[in-house]
């Protein structure tokens, strides 16, 4: 087995030939490479599958033996400094490697069809393979220098993929925003690494932790300086994992292709920050203030992300804020010292969120057949609805991911989120109340997404009926330019919806006002098939995606169903003590500051109590979302109750004002972007204008003033002479005599 560990260094580099070969092929044989572009997906998937098999093999050995392996090559630069490069294989490395490869394979299979008509197909697969290579290099790194190198490569790949359609201004701006925001965190990370090396003299994790603890125990170092270094290290994770207040890049990152959104949110970019904190947790534990800061940032992000997701119209942005909130749960767990719960939620959330993003990609793909390539419309949930009958397989997969993220048993996220909620009660009741309340908000906004997308009828052709703004429908190319294909929308659907047969014949002859009929379902079919409508408009409807897009969703659905078993509290299956808690054995020895000496009976009691409470909150959130967003005509039996509630609710202006405040808060992203735009961007522009004024008016003014002064002096002097040489000689002699006399009387 040790022979296998010796060759583990190859794990990050197995997928590296793909971007190299694509680049060489486009450089030397561009025509042939482009003609055979669909063949490049197979080696990409094959090589990543080899990495997955390798990682699974190592993980099985980790579970059975808890063996930790580190190999280091030392490069001595001089007598005082040597650079060590190597790889580190432990349970955290294996967990992340399996997560990256399994999600990455599903995304690559999905992307083969999703990106098949895109001009940048080859570029996309080159970026994706480089992305997987960078992330695998990050998780196998044995020291902080390697971490930082691969950290920057992960960031670079994410910027390239966020701005993949770089000719679209929104995509280019999103790429710049992600770059600038992460520069803040990455600069802090670099300073923290240098500060730790200056203090401990080592970059290696094992040596670093031991030296760090010895310095603190013996009071041989400035504790304030160590705290500052730890804060700077944590700043890198805050930016990369979209934690408050450096979260602003994450929603805009949805401008990239949907498959890369799934990979970024599940297993790569945002997971890198959680991995860094988990890797450095022994260091952070030695500084209690940092642990409290991590927990505080986590709980703020949990609540902040959930509230911002409440009123989003874009399906991908809604899921992005959901990711932000769930990452906050992981950071909260790490801050509480619940290492296993954080990694467990990282695993379950990765598969659930990958399923949701691939499902949203299937929805967007189907909507593009109706509205064309227009992200403002194909991703707008207001224009969706009624997709259940058009994309039933996608609907079932999306529902499974939604229920999992809501925390409904026995799906994956229920087990991990409930463990975090249980630990939060032991850490701080205030944090626990916020975390549990946010669990209800999560159920609310996730079912809001589901109901707006799949329930009711397609709102695209019902905009007059549903009160939506009547926007012109146009298509734009894959490169962001408006096309000339216009879908005419002159058909007054609301009026036609409520006509009887006699009124239809005179529809074009006179203008009539018609009463509203709430039973829309009966009126929908004639609108599509009745021969009485003499209109030139052709209405298209979404359709289910192809099998190559549905297969990854099916596999991720299986993960969402069963992956929660590896960390469930069912430690014994029967009298023979079959242990199902694989994660507990996998992460041995595990860090848990809240359960150092707890018994199974106490754990069971806490689990049942908190599980009942959290599931109740989740179902309450689902009920509220169903009450407000489930179409009236699909639940007519509750119509009288709902009408009476709405009437009594609208009379209370206080509640109406609160709802408006919450909506504005969510729709305007918590005003954080506005604050940054005014304070940072506006402040920098004011500083630039002041600098420009100082440079042009003061610096250039002084220089120009000297030149102008010389000009006027020269103009004045030129009129002193009369143009006669004898006068000049006489004047020169007079000045010379005066000069000699002055020198004589002064020095002699």
Curated annotation (Swiss-Prot):
Q: Transmembrane region positions?
A: 9-29, 40-60, 89-109, 125-145, 147-167, 185-205, 219-239, 258-278, 280-300, 327-347, 354-374, 396-416, 425-445, 550-570, 611-631, 728-748
Q: What is its EC number?
A: 7.1.1.-
Please provide one cellular component term from the Gene Ontology annotations of this protein. Answer: chloroplast thylakoid membrane
What's any GO biological process attached to this entry? ATP synthesis coupled electron transport
Give the record's membrane topology.
Multi-pass membrane protein
Keywords for this protein: Chloroplast, Membrane, NAD, NADP, Plastid, Plastoquinone, Quinone, Thylakoid, Translocase, Transmembrane, Transmembrane helix, Transport
Q: What is the effect of changing residue 170 to S?
A: In strain: cv. Borszczagowski
**Which class of enzymes does this protein belong to?**
translocase
* Compartment(s) of residence: Plastid, Chloroplast thylakoid membrane
In terms of InterPro entries, this protein maps to: NADH_UbQ_OxRdtase_chlpt_su5_C, NADHpl_OxRdtase_5_subgr, ND/Mrp_TM, NU5C-like, Proton_antipo_N
Pfam hit, one: Proton_antipo_M
Instruction: Say what the protein does.
Output: NDH shuttles electrons from NAD(P)H:plastoquinone, via FMN and iron-sulfur (Fe-S) centers, to quinones in the photosynthetic chain and possibly in a chloroplast respiratory chain. The immediate electron acceptor for the enzyme in this species is believed to be plastoquinone. Couples the redox reaction to proton translocation, and thus conserves the redox energy in a proton gradient.
By sequence similarity, the record places it as follows: Belongs to the complex I subunit 5 family.
What's the subunit arrangement here?
NDH is composed of at least 16 different subunits, 5 of which are encoded in the nucleus.
Q: What is this protein called?
A: NAD(P)H-quinone oxidoreductase subunit 5, chloroplastic
- Name the gene behind this protein: ndhF
């Amino acid at each position: 087995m040790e022979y296998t560990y010796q060759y583990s260094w190859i794990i990050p580099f197995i997928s590296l030939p793909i971007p190299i070969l694509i680049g060489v092929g486009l450089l030397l044989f561009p025509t042939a490479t482009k003609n055979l572009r669909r063949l490049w997906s197979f080696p990409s998937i094959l090589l990543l599958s080899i990495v997955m098999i390798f990682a699974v093999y190592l993980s099985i050995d980790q579970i059975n033996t808890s063996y930790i392996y580190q190999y280091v090559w030392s490069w001595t630069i001089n007598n005082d400094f040597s650079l060590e490069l190597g790889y580190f294989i432990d349970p955290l490395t294996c967990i992340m490697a399996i997560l990256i490869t399994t999600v990455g394979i599903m995304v690559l299979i999905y992307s083969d069809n999703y990106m098949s008509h895109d001009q940048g197909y080859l570029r996309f697969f080159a970026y994706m393979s480089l992305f997987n290579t960078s992330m695998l290099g990050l998780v196998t790194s044995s020291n902080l220098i390697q971490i930082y190198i691969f950290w920057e490569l992960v960031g670079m790949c994410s910027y390239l993929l966020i701005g993949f359609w770089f000719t679209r201004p929104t995509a280019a701006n999103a790429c710049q925003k992600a770059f600038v925001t992460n520069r803040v965190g990455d600069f802090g990370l670099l300073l923290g690494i240098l500060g730790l090396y200056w203090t401990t003299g080592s970059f290696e994790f094992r040596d670093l932790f031991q030296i760090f603890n010895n310095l603190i125990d013996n009071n041989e170092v400035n504790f304030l300086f160590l705290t500052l270094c730890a804060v700077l290290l944590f700043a890198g994770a805050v930016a990369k994992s979209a934690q408050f207040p450096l979260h602003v890049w994450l929603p805009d990152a949805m401008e990239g292709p949907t498959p890369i959104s799934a990979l970024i949110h599940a297993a790569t970019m945002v997971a890198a920050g959680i991995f860094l904190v988990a890797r450095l947790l022994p260091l952070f534990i030695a500084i209690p203030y940092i642990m409290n800061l991590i927990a505080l940032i986590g709980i703020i992000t949990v609540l902040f992300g959930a509230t911002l997701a409440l009123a989003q119209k874009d399906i991908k942005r809604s899921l992005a804020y959901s990711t932000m909130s769930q990452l906050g749960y992981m950071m909260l767990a790490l801050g509480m010292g619940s290492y296993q719960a954080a990694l467990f939620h990282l695993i379950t959330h990765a598969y659930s969120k990958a399923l949701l993003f691939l499902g949203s990609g299937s929805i967007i793909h189907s909507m593009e057949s109706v509205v064309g390539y227009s992200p403002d419309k194909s991703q707008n949930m207001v224009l969706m609805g009624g997709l259940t009958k058009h994309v039933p397989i996608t609907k079932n997969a999306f529902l499974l991911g939604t229920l999992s993220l809501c925390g409904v048993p026995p799906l994956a996220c229920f087990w991990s989120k409930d463990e975090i909620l249980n630990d939060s009660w032991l850490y701080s009741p205030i944090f626990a109340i916020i975390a549990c309340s946010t669990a209800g908000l999560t159920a609310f906004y996730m079912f809001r997404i589901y109901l707006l997308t799949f329930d009711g009828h397609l709102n695209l052709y019902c905009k007059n009926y549903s009160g939506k703004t009547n926007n012109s429908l146009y298509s734009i190319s894959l490169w962001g330019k408006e096309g000339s294909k216009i879908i005419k929308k002159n058909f007054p659907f609301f009026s036609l919806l409520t006509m009887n047969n006699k009124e239809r014949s005179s529809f074009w002859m006179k203008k009539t006002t018609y009463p509203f009929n709430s039973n829309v379902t009966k009126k929908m079919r004639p609108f599509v098939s009745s021969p009485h409508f003499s209109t030139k408009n052709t209405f298209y409807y979404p359709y289910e995606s192809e099998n190559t897009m549905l297969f990854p969703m099916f596999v991720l659905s299986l993960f969402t169903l069963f992956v929660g078993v590896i960390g469930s509290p069912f430690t014994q299956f029967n009298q023979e003590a079959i242990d199902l808690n694989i994660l507990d054995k996998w992460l041995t020895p595990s860090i848990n500051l809240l359960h150092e000496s707890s018994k199974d009976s106490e754990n069971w009691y806490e689990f049942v109590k908190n599980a009942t409470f959290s599931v109740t909150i989740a179902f309450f959130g689902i009920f509220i979302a169903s009450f407000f967003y489930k179409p009236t005509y699909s639940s007519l039996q509750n119509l009288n109750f709902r009408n009476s509630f709405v009437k009594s609710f609208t009379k209370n202006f206080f509640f109406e004002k609160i709802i408006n405040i919450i909506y504005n808060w969510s729709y305007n992203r918590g005003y954080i972007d506005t604050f940054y735009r005014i304070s940072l961007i506006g402040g920098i522009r004011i500083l630039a204008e002041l600098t420009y004024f100082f440079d042009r008016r003061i610096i250039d003014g002084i220089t120009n003033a000297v030149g102008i002064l010389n000009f006027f002096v020269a103009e004045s002097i030129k009129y002193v002479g009369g143009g006669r040489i004898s006068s000049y000689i006489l004047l020169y002699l007079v000045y010379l005599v005066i000069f000699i006399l002055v020198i004589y009387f002064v020095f002699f």
